[in-house]
């Protein structure tokens, strides 16, 4: 397709074997291999996006660039509080290992943090603690996959889960509970990723602070975030924990791997978490804000899920399926409730209809969902109740059938023998040939030719609308001086003119 804005499909990362997924040898066909599938690239949709470094626009993956950038950023933060005989916990999250289906950049950043702490402070007692949500085995799976247990040393790298022992922390809103083993060192380093991820929950308010109420918190405190508060006010929980005297007495600095919808863009590090948060917020408005706005404008299509992750955490163009489904401007705080959050789900009746006009329905353009590859371990029955769903193969059906969090999924879905059969059925009843594939591809999105043409036609107006109308509103709602952030030295150097 030389000279065209419609390209050959992008080959996604291969399936990852997981205790939560199907046997990978049963995945005999990927969705990008379907007839008629092409890709649309971000260089054509939004050419103003910053150049990715991993993979670059030629598809090259040079992990040394991640280390070089991380070393540069980490040598600029203050580590003077750390003494040579001190203990340090580097706090990570499992989400960092699933960016574009390739956790190598996040793993490299974690290793670099360890190495630079040793270089600058002489401290040797450095541990890695990786938090998870509902899939308690996943963190240890990624630690072994990237050999972080070997890199950090025996017993120094392990997962932490919400049901692990907790300790009380006095905060401005009362006693909350964090994980004991996250905070059992003298110092902590907050090591995370900046993609919008669950923006349907956090609404990009203090996004960089969220792991303090998620990855590092006990179940009781995580539950207040998800169920006691609405999607805009819940972020007070994370801020209260982070600003507590206990956590502040241990906090040193933060280091983030920074993607755009296209690929990894940079690494950011700062002692001031709120300054870092401002930078990633503006960056995400200018990048994720555009592809997410474009998604809300799509009409009549079939979704194919084909990624190593739970159903809500399947990626297309860097955006998870849960956000795609919401079909509203998730950055606009005037929008009260997305169509999907655990909080919103409680407001649907037994027929699957919102009980209040304040609850938005899921994306009306979704006419069918085809599940070729996904993991269990996350409540997902909501989607099979809302959208006609076809599961590819008994191996995939068995994943959901045996999953305690999805016991009723098969009551609302059918099983096809293989992917072509599933697609043939979906085309017939959905009455559309437009397809979008959630497979984590980097650089662009695998879609049908008809949907690629629709996206290319919509993109210029979306870009103008986001730049001139939406971003000023989003910034004002959060009390952010986005022009000052954009003109700051770190933002210009680290996010726009990346030094390699």
Describe each model-derived feature in a short phrase.
Residues 70-91, 122, 296-297:
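Glycine-rich phosphate/diphosphate-binding loops that line cofactor/substrate pockets in enzymes
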Residues 103-154:
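Membrane helical hairpin/interfacial module
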Residues 233-303, 308-309:
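C-terminal functional extensions of proteins
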Residues 136-203:
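An acidic, phosphate/nucleotide-engaging active-site surface
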Residues 86-103, 127-133, 437-439:
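Short glycine-rich or small-residue beta-strand-to-loop segments that form or flank ligand, phosphate
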Residues 174-261, 271:
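Divalent-metal (Mg2+/Mn2+/Ca2+)-assisted nucleotide/phosphate chemistry catalytic cores
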Residues 14, 19-35, 318-500:
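C-terminal non-catalytic interaction/assembly regions of soluble proteins
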Residues 2-65:
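N-terminal amphipathic/basic leader segments beginning at the initiator methionine
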């Amino acid at each position: 397709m030389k000279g065209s804005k419609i390209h050959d499909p992008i080959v996604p990362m291969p399936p990852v074997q997981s205790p939560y997924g199907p046997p990978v040898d049963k995945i005999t066909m990927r969705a990008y291999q379907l007839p008629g599938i092409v890709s649309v690239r971000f260089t054509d949709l939004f050419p103003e996006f910053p150049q990715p470094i991993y993979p670059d626009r030629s598809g090259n993956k040079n992990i040394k660039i991640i280390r070089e950038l991380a070393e540069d950023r980490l040598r600029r933060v203050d580590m003077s509080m750390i003494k040579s005989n001190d203990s340090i916990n580097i706090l990570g999250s499992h989400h960092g290992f699933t960016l574009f289906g390739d956790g190598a950049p996040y793993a490299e950043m974690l290793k670099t943090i360890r190495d630079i702490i040793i270089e600058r402070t002489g401290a040797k007692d450095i541990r890695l603690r990786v938090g998870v949500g509902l899939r308690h085995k996943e963190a240890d799976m990624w630690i072994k996959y990237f050999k972080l247990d070997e890199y950090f040393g025996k017993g120094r790298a392990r997962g932490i889960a919400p049901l692990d022992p907790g300790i009380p922390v006095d905060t401005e809103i009362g006693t909350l509970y964090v994980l004991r083993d996250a905070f059992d060192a003298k110092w902590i380093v907050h090591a995370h990723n900046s993609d919008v991820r669950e923006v349907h929950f956090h609404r990009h308010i203090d996004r960089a602070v969220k792991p303090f109420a998620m990855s590092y918190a006990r179940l009781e405190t995580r539950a207040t975030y998800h169920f006691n508060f609405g999607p805009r006010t819940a972020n007070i929980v994370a801020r209260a924990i982070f600003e507590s005297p206990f956590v502040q007495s241990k906090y040193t600095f933060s280091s983030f791997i920074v993607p755009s919808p296209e690929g990894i863009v940079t690494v950011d590090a700062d002692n001031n978490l709120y300054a870092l948060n401002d930078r990633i917020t503006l960056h995400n408005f200018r990048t994720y804000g555009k592809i997410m706005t474009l998604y809300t404008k799509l009409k009549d299509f079939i979704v194919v899920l084909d990624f190593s992750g739970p159903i809500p955490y399947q990626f297309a163009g860097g955006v998870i399926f849960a956000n795609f489904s919401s079909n509203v401007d998730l950055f606009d705080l005037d929008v009260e409730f997305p169509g999907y959050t655990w909080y919103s789900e409680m407001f649907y009746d037994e027929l699957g209809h919102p009980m209040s006009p304040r609850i938005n329905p899921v994306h009306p353009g979704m006419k069918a969902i085809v599940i070729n590859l996904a993991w269990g371990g996350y409540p997902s029955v909501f989607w099979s109740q809302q959208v006609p769903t076809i599961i590819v193969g008994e191996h995939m059906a068995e994943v959901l059938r045996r999953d305690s969090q999805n016991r009723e999924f098969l009551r609302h879905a059918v099983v096809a023998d293989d992917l072509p059969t599933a697609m043939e059925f979906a085309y017939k009843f959905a009455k559309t040939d437009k397809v979008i594939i959630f497979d984590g591809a980097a650089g662009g999105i695998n879609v049908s030719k008809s949907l690629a043409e629709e996206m290319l036609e919509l993109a210029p107006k979306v870009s103008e609308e986001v730049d001139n109308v939406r971003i000023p509103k989003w910034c004002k709602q959060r009390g952010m001086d986005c022009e000052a952030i954009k003109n700051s030295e770190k933002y210009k150097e680290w996010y726009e003119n990346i030094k390699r």
